[in-house]
Amino acid sequence: MKILVDENMPYARDLFSRLGEVIAVPGRPIPVAQLADADALMVRSVTKVNESLLAGKPIKFVGTATAGTDHVDEAWLKQAGIGFSAAPGCNAIAVVEYVFSSLLMLAERDGFSLHERTVGIVGVGNVGRRLQARLEALGIKTLLCDPPRADCGDEGDFRSLDELVQRADILTFHTPLFKDGPYKTLHLADEKLIRSLKPGAILINACRGAVVDNTALLTCLNEGQKLSVVLDVWEGEPELNVELLTKVDIGTPHIAGYTLEGKARGTTQVFEAYSKFIGHEQHVALDTLLPAPEFGRITLHGPLDQPTLKRLVHLVYDVRRDDAPLRKVAGIPGEFDKLRKNYLERREWSSLYVICDDASAASLLCKLGFNAVHHPAR
């Protein structure tokens, strides 16, 4: 059995070698010759999986180690009788922590408290729900918009996008990319929406680049609209609008979900799905794969305020470490993908063990996803 895996999927060689011969290949582009005698293909979001790639090939299963699936023609795979699995929610925690790192940086720079802001969350799936829970644990008001879930009767106080635009100080997008249909998200943030945002609002896109109309956004920024912008995703990736990058406050190369834990979850989820598909079901404990974190433990004295939270969050991950490298190489062919391929190891908040002498601080940190314990001061 021959299994092709994206060369940038961590732990893929070790895991899939339990099931057959593993060949690591670049994800963009996939070397077509390797598909001629392969049984399975494991990809990331950079690989377009469709009829033109796989027609006439012996591939029986495709796995994507990503939550999103807009790079995969699922309908054609089903028609062709090819098994498929994604990794829903694998990087949700990572994306939430990226948003927090960005907001805490902007709050410190601009001198505001997040408690004074209302956050509008567009898309309330694996990422949106987790973001809502962590924001509300901190006492930060949220507004939710998710028309498909609202129409299905899902639990939640869902509001219209227009209401979020009118009321939210921070608008953050966490939707799939739907190019048409009743729930179209292509250019969901169009020029009209962007111009309607509150003065001084923060716009965040960490889902799919084309959810925000990049041309319209640049037009508004060039005309002097007072707006802070965080973009992790871009229309036309791996190409991006270099002028737009110079205008945004934080710009990163589609790495919001790139924690070691998130990547490992993605790989293990598709590994487990494929092992079940071929009748040799196996399960993997995530902690058996992950290395020891850089910081073993730290001690926190007193209550948890916003400056302290910012220091803890940025101790684990400061978004500026990914903003600066992109600005240095923007516009140089191949560099966007190179930044992603050679991405520095990044951990999640759960990797940080925090000893608190304040019980309320320990409790709150646990709700936020840190590994915190209360040890009273002596």
Swiss-Prot record:
Subcellular location: Cytoplasm
Pfam families, per database record: 2-Hacid_dh, 2-Hacid_dh_C, DUF3410
Binding-site list for substrate: S45, T66, Y258
SUPFAM superfamilies the UniProt entry points to: Formate/glycerate dehydrogenase catalytic domain-like, NAD(P)-binding Rossmann-fold domains
This protein's UniProt keywords: Cytoplasm, NAD, Oxidoreductase, Pyridoxine biosynthesis
Family matches, as InterPro entries: D-isomer_2_OHA_DH_cat_dom (IPR006139), D-isomer_DH_CS (IPR029753), D-isomer_DH_CS1 (IPR029752), D-isomer_DH_NAD-bd (IPR006140), Erythronate-4-P_DHase (IPR020921), Erythronate-4-P_DHase_dimer (IPR024531), NAD(P)-bd_dom_sf (IPR036291), PdxB_dimer_sf (IPR038251)
Protein origin, superkingdom: Bacteria
Protein's GO biological process: 'de novo' pyridoxal 5'-phosphate biosynthetic process; pyridoxine biosynthetic process
GO molecular function: 4-phosphoerythronate dehydrogenase activity; NAD binding; protein dimerization activity
Family: Belongs to the D-isomer specific 2-hydroxyacid dehydrogenase family. PdxB subfamily.
Protein's UniProt name: Erythronate-4-phosphate dehydrogenase
